[in-house]
């Protein structure tokens, strides 16, 4: 029994380069999603003010 060896997985420390690339990829993905959301909100706001300026909509409640 003393001669038997069990294969164990060797644990390595964290790979700094790999973690940097993963962090960079996640950061760019999150930043891209945030910019797309921001552009969508800008488009909605711009459309609202364009319609308001042309008189197609009003922010004053219509009196009956």
From Swiss-Prot:
InterPro entries: COX5C. It is found in: Mitochondrion inner membrane. It comes from the Eukaryota. GO terms for cellular component: mitochondrial inner membrane; mitochondrion. Keywords: Membrane, Mitochondrion, Mitochondrion inner membrane, Transmembrane, Transmembrane helix. The chain crosses the membrane at residues 15-34. Its main location: mitochondrion. The keyword Secreted does not apply. Belongs to the cytochrome c oxidase subunit 5C family. This protein is one of the nuclear-coded polypeptide chains of cytochrome c oxidase, the terminal oxidase in mitochondrial electron transport. This is Probable cytochrome c oxidase subunit 5C-1.
């Amino acid at each position: 029994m003393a001669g038997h060896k069990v294969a164990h997985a060797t644990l390595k420390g964290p790979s700094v380069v790999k973690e940097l690339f993963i962090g960079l990829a996640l950061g760019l993905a999150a930043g891209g999603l945030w910019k797309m959301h921001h552009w969508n909100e800008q488009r909605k706001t711009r459309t609202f003010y364009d319609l308001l300026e042309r008189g197609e909509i009003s922010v004053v409640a219509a009196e009956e």
